[in-house]
Amino acid sequence: MKIAVIGQSLFGQEVYCQLRKEGHEVVGVFTIPDKDGKADPLGLEAEKDGVPVFKFPRWRARGQALPEVVAKYQALGAELNVLPFCSQFIPMEVINAPRHGSIIYHPSLLPRHRGASAINWTLIHGDKKGGFTIFWADDGLDTGDLLLQKECDVLPDDTVSTLYNRFLFPEGIKGMVQAVRLIAEGTAPRRPQPEEGATYEGIQKKETAMINWDQPAEAIHNWIRGNDKVPGAWTEACGQKLTFFNSTLNTSGLVAQGEALPIPGAHRPGLVTKAGLILFGNDDRMLLVKNIQLEDGKMMPASQFFKGSASSALELTEEELATAEAVRSSWMRILPNVPEVEDSTDFFKSGAASVDVVRLVEEVKELCDGLELENEDVYMATTFGDFIQLLVRKLRGEDGESECVINYVEKAVKKLTLQMPYQLFIGGEFVDAEGAKTYSTINPTDGSVICQVSLAQVSDVDKAVAAAKEAFENGLWGKINARDRGRLLYRLADLMEQHQEELATIEALDAGAVYTLALKTHVGMSIQTFRYFAGWCDKIQGATIPINQARPNRNLTLTKKEPVGVCGIVIPWNYPLMMLSWKTAACLAAGNTVVIKPAQVTPLTALKFAELTLKAGIPKGVVNILPGSGSLVGQRLSDHPDVRKIGFTGSTEVGKHIMKSCALSNVKKVSLELGGKSPLIIFADCDLNKAVQMGMSSVFFNKGENCIAAGRLFVEDSIHDQFVQKVVEEVGKMKIGNPLDRDTNHGPQNHEAHLRKLVEYCQRGVKEGATLVCGGNQVPRPGFFFQPTVFTDVEDHMYIAKEESFGPIMIISRFADGDVDAVLSRANATEFGLASGVFTRDINKALYVSDKLQAGTVFVNTYNKTDVAAPFGGFKQSGFGKDLGEAALNEYLRIKTVTFEY
């Protein structure tokens, strides 16, 4: 069929291309004249194909068709006119000329919303259904007979752009092609339009788009979204015309608190909040506006209205500079009248129109493979310099908002000036707790107060979980490629390394960790952990599985590993940063978001870590950190219906309670690393000197505040006395002192309550008849220092033989020479099974003992040798689930099975 296409825009271009693919002959294209030297996309495409293109500025004069225009049209011999999107008035001499007449696309369900702003009015009226109509043109305004209609649901927050992009554009193209096909087949219907329900609304212009505030919130919301992006709903405020975009009625969780924005005629002043601008209808319901355009055309997040643009300019890498130049070339092609694109060049002031926005977005997305870029981003950053900054932030995984304001406590320590955040970290911002509640965090070296830290309340947990859920379901974190997620975690690890001295010093200050150990282990292994799991991000794979075929058809079954969602992580006080890293790195690598509760007594490195996530570009809401009590914060995380996983390290008693709460709330996935009473068996055929050194480390490492510490040493009778003698000699060489001193190897216990428990533990051991060889008391100096302690003659029935001290207390028991099975029986006679160890030169004995020990980790001729690649976790009442290694990822993933039939 010979077709004349009359119209413009990318929509017209796509319809033209599809009609040619269907085999129709497009005999001519009629489009609008070039604007500022730029041709319309429809005309450009037709010219490339050698199709005659006509660009009449008008078809009529004084209501009469121009004869020369009609003559050029008639010379083509078209059998059908197709008007996919046309802004010109076409005379009836042209409309009625072809054998099959003319068909027009209209973006509403006629007879409703006749007129040029049909999409706008569909939204303004709050219609629940939208769609398009293809009708036979007549001499009325959108009144012709109906040929084809398709409808869709209108979502509560749809705008002109989202409705157009989701349905009206892609389905409209298909609809036009289908309509032409029906005409060619002779089956196209002609149904008269009913007059019942018919409406006509005028074209929406800027001067008519002013907001009427004397109506309910829903009506105001519909007005704003119905005018988004063109012409833009506006109001007068702060002495200028403000245009509002991205409105939503979804205000659950929002509190009507913020900086007041007086709006003449409004029922109540607007409130500028961190979420955006809260507005009120005359029914007192809230709506939220996320973007504001100033009178000078500058677009900004509504949350930044009173702040301006506070983010500092990014320094671009060489690769990013190359990308910027490629984007500059795109701007040059789209803006041919601009001699040179500079940072100050404004896209729209240089002549760009909405169609150019679509072109720019598509070109940049093609240039930056996989980038999430939307038309709105161009409106938010109209100058080239701003656009490049926005683009680079997106490529880096940042959200592009202004830098977070961080309040610090500053302390000068050992030639370092520590800057320590002390507020809750929720949704990418440091904020006070509900009611501004705080508590003191104590320096265990001298008992002094380091600073006041925000004390999270139940409402703060709810806010943090909401932020994590939003980041998981709607944020950038769930959209970026797995490899890009890994890149962000690598950057975070690099930043941790750059700040390792500061982090180690904070660990020493807040947790009493010996600085040199903190640098190597607390911080060093944390860095290694994030690097290890960063490498896993793009290697989380499913499988294809052969199943019985549904003959004669066939089947394909595959599995996908998916993140579970919002995770709660509750960490202990012995390794504040390392325990955070062990769990959080795997959690984030799997694609989850997280709410972390650090131990109440050691919050400061976790909050410093939060700051580093901002610097690394981790999107807001992905990581949230809440210092506070277990009874409030930990309990609420366990009970919260939106938390899908809890990772916990701590006592068995609390672990049982968490497990119960997780089961009763929503059957959360749980992993628990709980108490231990790890046995270390030292045989007479060992390397005694090594056994002594490793035995010392197994107990006194990190002041005994070590989950896998050897809770009980079994020493073969023939070397027992010699072993004890050497241990006591080594204990005498240990320097107890300020953990910040580089030659200290034994610092203070973590907090005073724990120190008191250690004193009581030793008193009970003596009372039950164990021999106290050395230590057993607090060191007579300020702070929470406890003497390295050695007990011998410990019998199996004694309290100290069965219960964990979690301190620098060595418990030694004899066993008869050669009685391997008996000592194994004693070693396994515990409800704990976190770790264990054996020292022997006999490989057969080592293998046999390692087989029989009931523990998640067995060390042979070594101790404390954990590694980021080796799974770590316990048996029995020491918990279940793994940290570290590939196995840790499975704790934060769920497996979905998908089966196809074909």
From Swiss-Prot:
GO biological process: 10-formyltetrahydrofolate catabolic process; biosynthetic process; NADPH regeneration; tetrahydrofolate interconversion
Catalytic activity: (6R)-10-formyltetrahydrofolate + NADP(+) + H2O = (6S)-5,6,7,8-tetrahydrofolate + CO2 + NADPH + H(+)
GO cellular component, one term: cytosol
Residues modified to O-(pantetheine 4'-phosphoryl)serine: 354
Active site residues according to the UniProt entry: 106 (proton donor), 673 (proton acceptor), 707 (proton donor)
Molecular function (Gene Ontology), one example: aldehyde dehydrogenase (NAD+) activity
Chain sites annotated for binding (6R)-10-formyltetrahydrofolate: 88-90, 142
Membrane-spanning residues: none
UniProt region (Aldehyde dehydrogenase domain), positions on chain: 417-902
Gene3D superfamilies (UniProt xref): ACP-like (1.10.1200.10), Aldehyde Dehydrogenase, Chain A, domain 1 (3.40.605.10), Aldehyde Dehydrogenase, Chain A, domain 2 (3.40.309.10), Formyl transferase, C-terminal domain (3.10.25.10), Formyl transferase, N-terminal domain (3.40.50.170)
Protein name as catalogued: Cytosolic 10-formyltetrahydrofolate dehydrogenase
Organism expressing this protein natively: Mus musculus
GN (gene name): Aldh1l1
